[in-house]
């Protein structure tokens, strides 16, 4: 009987160690990919702006803050968790180190969604309230939003000092309420999932709903204004309107100037919506299972929660690659060998465009000149014939 019990215990220990080994390998891979991706994104942003001789835009500034939050998540959250799993089931740090470790693990998990809300609020301010956006400083508002996000993350992570402790009997760094159902556990779990996942997702969704609504209304108003102008007869004649429209279609610079701003604005909105959606759906299984485990602890197992948390950890890996996918031109510019090569390519393209436009202009002038010469010849013929007729009239009269 004792041998059977010992065998069952050994089997459970071996199964637990294999699961821990899998978690260590997986989290190490996620940490490495997240570090490489976010560092590469920082290089792309700074290098592309350096090549194009531009300052970092407000949206890029907030994305840089998000990259820093993801880097801290990879180093502080995943890195310390890997070290803890390596020494499982013992924890060799002190009680204060246990509390501090759990605090720094939670800090990036609050900072990342708060920064996504800051990006959403910045886009709402720029598109839905453009006058207030241009009156305020271009970089002061994003800096204040980022500072508020970091400050809230620091404050809301403080309960970790009271929830976690190192137990003297087991020697583990675990929560004070354990695995059983507890009022403190339910309150803390619901508070974390509401503040770090649900509330930021709702705020970002509200901001982007207002942004999409404003874009749709502005396009509808522009169409209605054009229709009303046509009805009131404010446009020129049909021939003149067709001529102007044809010139606009032929003008490459006009098309680029009119579409560049709208394209960048829509692209930025799509980028941030994609990042917010990924954050919501990747953390949703972990947050829901965490709440279920707090309310009904007998249903789920702790290792099952660890496996579900795998999806949430992927968020720090996907964010930089989403930005790179939406800004492939920046990546190409950042990967140029030098600024000189990029400048030479730009000058070459500009020279080719200038040459083509100059050729077209010369052809245009030549055609106009040819038309004017033909018109002058016809006028000269008419004048000569008129002069001949006048001479003959004078001769007849004499």
Swiss-Prot record:
Tissue specificity of this protein: Detected in the ADL sensory neurons, the RMED and RMEV motor neurons, and the PQR tail neuron. In males, detected in SPC tail neurons involved in spicule penetration and sperm transfer, and male-specific oblique muscles involved in vulval contact.
Localization, UniProt: Cell membrane
Phenotype of the disrupted gene, per the record: Viable and fertile. Males have reduced reproductive success, due to a range of aberrant mating behaviors. Double knockouts with ntr-1 partially rescue the reproductive phenotypes.
Extracellular side, ranges: 1-25, 80-99, 165-187, 293-302
Membrane association type: Multi-pass membrane protein
Keywords: Behavior, Cell membrane, Disulfide bond, G-protein coupled receptor, Glycoprotein, Membrane, Receptor, Transducer, Transmembrane, Transmembrane helix
InterPro entries xrefs: GPCR_Rhodpsn, GPCR_Rhodpsn_7TM, Neuropeptide-GPCR
Protein's name in the database: Nematocin receptor 2
Organism: Caenorhabditis elegans
Gene name for this UniProt entry: ntr-2
